[in-house]
């Protein structure tokens, strides 16, 4: 079925970023939007929905607050209307539970009428100045086509599993994103090995530590030089997730951007320092009961190979600094290998309208567009290489959505802050009195 109606925006994918865009768009009478997602319902990282695990950003990083603090879709309004605001106030903690954030997002969805789930987009074409988005209803099999002037791509990132491992299809080798789906089976194993050193790896390690008392041998290896703490909670470092720094980073040459990003991974891929301390305290307590010997932690250990052996796996590592290889046996492997953006296949029909850099990545302009006109195809969380470490940050989602809405409507619907950082990033931004010409006659 094809509709004749033309939307102002069709968003593909309904994660937190496009959901925030849907919520911020809802009150705008002259902005007609539709959002599609292939999942049956909204569920944010269900495989990592561990009890008492919190977001790494304050609650103001909800779907709308940083764009419109008075929005009916704010987290504080959610708490008020669900009768939990005073409990939240007494708790005195800016960092909300991940389960709480997921419930909040579902609450917002329940008030919107511009989001459709179970719709798998199969193609996008361009004709007569409009984009045609065709999606299949995953429940009925029916196909529908909608038309729009603008696209917002919010399909997000996908779990990354190295190709050499993925092609082997090993039963008890899973990605962290699927942890809770397999936990019942994992806790029955005699030995489990976690590979990787980010927040998810640490959360799962801490979650499995109690199983050591029941006999499990638990290993944690990472190729990183150490188990790095997340270093973005100091105030001046947090200014790297600001409009000021996005401007600075975006204006750097492509080669320089790659270099800078390679040095900033611990700013968004490290482990919460409190969690590291909790893990150490748990290990210390286990040592009192002579149980710590069942736990192995090692940095500088790169996984080189994995082979299936009967009901277990033989893992071959390289100790990077020593240049020595070693093998271990384990019954299960949990890969904390992160996430990567995968370009959707449905973009093939409009590939001629998308700008690219020399390496094939999107050439994302400062206003988050990737099309030749710089005004039609926007991206969410696909611009790490052009906009820097603020890209996956929930706290910057409302800022990016404000930019998109203002661009699409041609007016300032949501005020956007220009300068918020105390520090200067570019030499051109230094105060005038510091750049006075030197008097060469002295």
Residue ranges and their predicted role:
Residues 1-40, 44-46, 88-199, 203-442:
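Flavin (primarily FAD) cofactor-binding/catalytic cores of flavoenzymes
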Residues 44-48, 56-79:
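Redox-cofactor-proximal catalytic regions of oxidoreductases
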Residues 66-99:
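A conserved beta-strand/loop capping segment in the N-terminal third of enzymes
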